[in-house]
Amino acid sequence: EIASCLVGSEMCIRDRNTVIQFLQYPYEQVVAENFVEILEKMELINDLSCYEEIYGILKKEALDGRKVEQQIIEVGTKRELFFGKDRLDTVLHYKDYTYMKRKWTAYLKRERKKEPDWVEVMTLLEAFFPPVWRAIIRDEIFIGDWMPELCRFL
C-alpha cells in the first residue's frame, strides 16, 4: 500500500518501510538557470541539454514571465553575468550558425533522439526571451504569462 502526499513544493511517497522524497523545482527557475548557462558559455557550451530543457518547458508549461525575469536577474547576478542587449542577440543568431547546428545534431545523436530541430528550438527561444531580456536591461518589471499552446506571452 503506497500513500502519496503533496506538501508545498515537496512530494513524498510512503510505503511501510521507505520514504522517497521528490523536490519540485519551479519551471521558471529551471528556465532561468539554463538560460544563464547559455549566456555564460555562448558557443563554447558543451552540454546542449540546456537548450533542450528550455525547449521542453516552453512547449508544455505555462510560465510567469515576471518570475523568470526575477530568477534570471538573481542567478545572473550570482554568476556575475553581463546583462547587455548584444549578449541575447548573439545567442539568437545561433539559429543560422552552422557550428551550433552541427553541435545540436551531434547532441541529439548522443542522446539517441531525432528531434527537435535546431531551428525549431531557436525559434521558440526567439519568441520567449527578447521581451523578458528587454525588461531586464531596461530595469523594468516584466508582466506576461507564457502560453505554450500559443507559443507567446499574454
Each model region followed by its residue ranges:
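Single conserved hydrophobic/aromatic residue that forms the stacking wall/gate
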Residues: 1-8, 12-13
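Short, cationic low-complexity segments
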Residues: 10, 14-23
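A ubiquitous short alpha-helical element
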Residues: 19-20, 38-41, 87-92, 112-113
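Phosphate/pyrophosphate- and phosphate-bearing ligand-binding catalytic cores of soluble enzymes
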Residues: 23-48, 52
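Short, hydrophobic/amphipathic alpha-helical patches that form generic packing surfaces
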Residues: 33-37, 52-58, 123-133
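Short helix-capping/linker segments at secondary-structure and domain boundaries
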Residues: 42-44, 59-67, 132-138
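Small-residue-rich helix-loop
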Residues: 51-98
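Long, low-complexity C-terminal extensions of enzymes
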Residues: 89-154
